[in-house]
Amino acid sequence: MAQQEVYLGNPNLKKANVSQNFTKKQVAEYLKCAENPIYFIQKYIKIVSLDEGIIPFKMYDFQESMVEKFHKHRFNIAKLPRQSGKSTIVTAYLLWYVLFNDNVNVAILANKAPTAREMLGRLQLSYENLPRWLQQGILGWNKGSLELENGSKILASSTSASAVRGMSFNVIFLDEFAFVPNHIADQFFSSVYPTISSGKNTKVIIISTPHGMNMFYKLWHDAERGQNEYVPTEVCLLYTSDAADDVRG
């Protein structure tokens, strides 16, 4: 890629307003990716392995099922153990979402801001390893946010009402929500949640390892009993060392 076509000197990133020529095969492939997030993730998402470096992300069956649910349903809640790839699969879906949907805003919110920024970093690494013809041009790129030329944006922050107050989001991802203090979780849901839940196509994805009696516990058990609009997913797996969290997220 010519220097004048890259974003801030990064040869892996295309800057905005750079024309892109497509072959017929690339057009067909682009349309296939836009239609099917599972296909896109299976074929084009790469992650970092401590032992092997950058490798293709090979999804387990339960991860494919999660992507199907994210795509089909507006409200998802998942209870998963550590080392299950829970954050990696969500960020892979969110990357697909902002690439192939114009003018959408996504929030990655975690119990700690550095955790949210680390997840955005994983997404950004996957983005840098996409073929140029699958990329959108970059308007903004830092540790806390990402902005694409199609108008779509991602914000990474801690789970708090103040972090996202005054902003509208099409997708909110709440990571390790069981570890958010009760008073913060209550404040978040009372002030921010109504904005997104009132939309027709907005999505909420809540994922956590269980951690006591709290809002996540209530939302989960209400979902199990069909008493709220969340689609529940529970994964109980023991992984061998080759599927450790540092590989699958």
Give the ranges of each region predicted by the language model.
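Phosphate/NTP-binding elements of NTP-utilizing enzymes
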Residues: 2-241, 248
